[in-house]
């Protein structure tokens, strides 16, 4: 059972290995959303995510014999690092089963913390089944990433820190994958202030908790599809589900393109890298149907590999019309490339890539295709560039951008 005494005990124990991440007031998000928005930056933890809280507290409750057997868990990344780090602190051996789709940065960091990594399955649920199989075969002690009350208690210490710093908080937004963080935060928040609203946020393509609440029982999704790999869970925790039903006020879902926009917002306005799962609560702020409230958005982690980061930035710029590609037809004769460049420069467009195709038509005397990838200030500027090209008789057509 989750009790205030246990949360207070966990806070003391967890403080041995975690940072008390201070709330960051966001002028940008507050103005954008019409509420007073505070960010709880768990991406600044030593392991890059909040997961170390639950892992360390859970391992602290084990007997010396259980720790000596060796520990095992399954994780999409952040819980893996939490368990690896906590196990190292307790001098225990850790084996981590991770989906084959786990970003390389999370795999390498887990190995660097001394854990043995086994890559198996496409999603968390498949990795978890493998971890249970290995636990039975070798006698390891299993540390569940979310469906464990001790783990949820450790995660809930975030709420203790939020209330300590912002006693009059009115709303807390918390990401949901399997539900451990949401269980701990919502339960402790309601114990400290029964009137507070705690809103869970899930990816639209992995909304297992929303489906479970709607059905009144733990529900398994047939598939999950989201860029938020850390919350790509098919089945939420059954042990913690009653706490979610009791203490969570609502669930908001967000699309992948909303996460991409949130990533750009955080990088450009807060100079902060937050992974896609950690951005769920930022993306959901626009869907919160209240104004003038004190809202805390929990940023659950920041472990993102550079390749994924690059892809998200590129897609974000394309979504916001700050990068686009246009196809124009030019007479195949000297000077035409310079002329189209002058047209673009005349409206402050910035060319970042050119592709010249002489074989777009069988009549080379008629025209050649030029694909121009441009940088713009946004939609209005993009339209201004297109208008200039139209007036220059270039017959511009928007085509797919490929950088």
Residue ranges and their predicted role:
Residues 1-403:
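PLP-dependent amino-acid enzyme catalytic core
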């Amino acid at each position: 059972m989750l009790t205030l005494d246990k949360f207070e005990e966990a806070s003391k124990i967890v403080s041995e290995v975690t940072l008390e991440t201070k709330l960051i007031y966001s002028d940008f998000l507050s103005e954008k959303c019409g509420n007073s928005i505070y960010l709880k930056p768990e991406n600044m933890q030593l392991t890059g995510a909040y997961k170390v809280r639950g892992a360390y507290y859970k391992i602290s409750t084990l007997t010396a014999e259980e720790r000596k057997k060796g520990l095992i868990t399954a994780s999409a990344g952040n819980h893996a690092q939490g368990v690896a780090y906590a196990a190292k602190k307790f001098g225990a051996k850790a084996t981590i089963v991770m989906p084959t789709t786990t970003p390389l940065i999370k795999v390498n960091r887990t190995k660097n913390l001394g854990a043995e990594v086994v890559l198996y399955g496409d999603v968390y649920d498949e990795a978890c089944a493998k971890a249970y199989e290995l636990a039975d075969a070798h006698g390891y002690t299993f540390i569940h990433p979310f469906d464990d009350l001790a783990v949820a208690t450790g995660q809930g210490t975030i709420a203790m820190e939020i209330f300590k710093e912002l006693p009059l908080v009115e709303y807390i937004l918390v990401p949901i994958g399997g539900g451990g963080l949401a269980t701990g935060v919502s339960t402790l928040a309601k114990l400290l202030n029964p009137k507070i609203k705690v809103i869970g946020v899930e990816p639209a393509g992995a909304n297992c908790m929303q489906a479970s609440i709607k059905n009144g029982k733990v529900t398994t999704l047939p598939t999950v599809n989201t860029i938020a790999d850390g919350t790509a869970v098919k089945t939420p925790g059954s042990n913690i589900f009653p706490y979610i039903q009791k203490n969570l006020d609502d669930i908001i879902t967000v699309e992948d393109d909303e996460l991409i926009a949130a990533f750009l917002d955080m990088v450009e306005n807060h100079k902060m890298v937050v992974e896609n799962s950690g951005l769920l609560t930022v993306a959901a702020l626009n869907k919160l149907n209240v104004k003038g409230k004190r809202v805390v958005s929990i940023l659950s982690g920041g472990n993102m590999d550079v390749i994924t980061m690059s892809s998200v930035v590129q897609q974000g710029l394309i979504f916001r019309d700050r990068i686009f590609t246009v196809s124009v037809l030019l007479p195949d004769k000297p000077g035409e490339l310079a002329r189209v460049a002058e047209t673009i420069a005349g409206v402050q467009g910035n060319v970042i890539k050119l592709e010249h195709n002489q074989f777009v038509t069988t009549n080379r005397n008629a025209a050649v295709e030029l694909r121009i990838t441009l940088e713009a200030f946004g939609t209005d500027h993009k339209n201004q560039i297109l208008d200039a090209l139209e007036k220059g008789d270039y017959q511009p057509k928007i085509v797919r951008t490929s950088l």
